[in-house]
Swiss-Prot record:
Keywords: Hydrolase, Membrane, Mitochondrion, Mitochondrion outer membrane, Transmembrane, Transmembrane helix. This is Serine/threonine-protein phosphatase Pgam5, mitochondrial. Gene3D superfamilies: Phosphoglycerate mutase-like (3.40.50.1240). It comes from the Eukaryota. The keyword Mitochondrion applies. Interacts with Pk92B/ASK1. It comes from Drosophila melanogaster. It catalyses: O-phospho-L-seryl-[protein] + H2O = L-seryl-[protein] + phosphate; O-phospho-L-threonyl-[protein] + H2O = L-threonyl-[protein] + phosphate.
């Protein structure tokens, strides 16, 4: 009986040691999630509440003392500086176009690009939005896309704002770099400052006197839209090239009264037939790499 007991105990100890060792094997160890709540947030991931320089606390005179009169003054000015309604910014990329010739004047939409713009216009009409402002890049392909969309939505063409800040370009050197697209540093400097100026012009929380939610439609370009998305969400702007959006797709961003930004659609083109889904220049007519 003693031998049997010793055998059982020895076998049990051996099995326990074996399984303990197996549990220590790196292949079977489960690490804590990198999103563990005890881990401090990296400084770069913190939200900048004054990203548009319109945070109310940054606009009013600071408290000079703790007297009731001064606190009342401060609170009244703070309330007066606060936005009350949200701003919705809907970005549409132009339709497919022909990259023929060196001048923008020859870069017209293809027949497929015109159909894409028509479907997008119908989709925007179905959403039932009452537009407060429509802005279009001054490049031909964006102008043609805008004209087609305007036939579908309730907005007067004469009120469209044509903005050169929205023209296509190289916003910032992408990370990771890509071998097939390497603009000169001077182009990033020239285009980047212009595109950033476009972002600051159109992306900000509502003015305090805005009494209802507003809707702005911007017809522009792939690089510009992707950069705007990264900047608005406070993602590293260098990551813009990792995003892909289709021709005539819809991207919808909302800026709340607090200044927080959320994205509703990113490159939405699911309302189009599959044969109209494109995101690059047609290869058979492309004259540049």
């Amino acid at each position: 009986m003693r031998k049997l007991t010793s055998f059982v105990c020895g076998t049990g100890a051996g099995l326990a040691a074996y399984y303990l060792q197996r549990l220590r094997d790196p292949q079977t160890v489960v690490q804590n999630s990198w999103t563990h709540s005890d881990k401090p947030v990296d400084p770069w991931a913190l939200w900048d509440t004054n990203w548009d320089c319109r945070e109310p606390r940054a606009l009013v005179r600071p408290l000079r003392n703790s007297q009731p009169e001064e606190e009342n003054r401060y609170n009244a000015e703070l309330e007066k500086a606060k936005a009350k309604k949200a701003r919705h910014i809907i970005l549409v990329r132009h339709g497919e176009y022909l990259d023929v010739g060196d001048s923008d004047d020859t870069h017209h939409l293809t027949e497929r690009g015109r159909k894409q713009a028509e479907f997008t216009g119908k989709r925007l009409c179905e959403l039932g939005i009452k537009w407060d402002k429509v802005v279009a890049s001054t490049m031909v392909r964006a102008q043609e896309t805008s004209d087609i969309i305007l036939k579908q939505i309730d907005f007067e063409k004469e009120k469209v704002v044509n903005c050169a800040f929205l023209r296509e370009g190289a916003p910032i050197p992408p990370q990771p770099p890509v071998g097939h697209w390497k603009p000169e540093a001077s182009q990033f400097l020239r285009d980047g400052s212009r595109i950033e100026a476009g972002f600051r012009r159109y992306f900000h929380r509502a003015y305090p006197d805005q009494e209802k939610e507003s809707y702005t439609l911007i017809v522009g370009h792939g690089n510009v839209i992707r950069y705007f998305v990264c900047r608005a969400l406070q993602f590293p702007a260098e990551g813009w090239l990792r995003i892909n959006i289709n021709h005539a797709s819809i991207t919808w961003l909302t800026i709340s009264p607090s200044g927080n930004v959320s994205i509703k659609y990113l490159g939405d083109s699911g309302f189009m037939p599959a044969e109209l889904l494109t995101n690059r220049i047609p290869r058979d007519v492309k004259n540049v790499v």
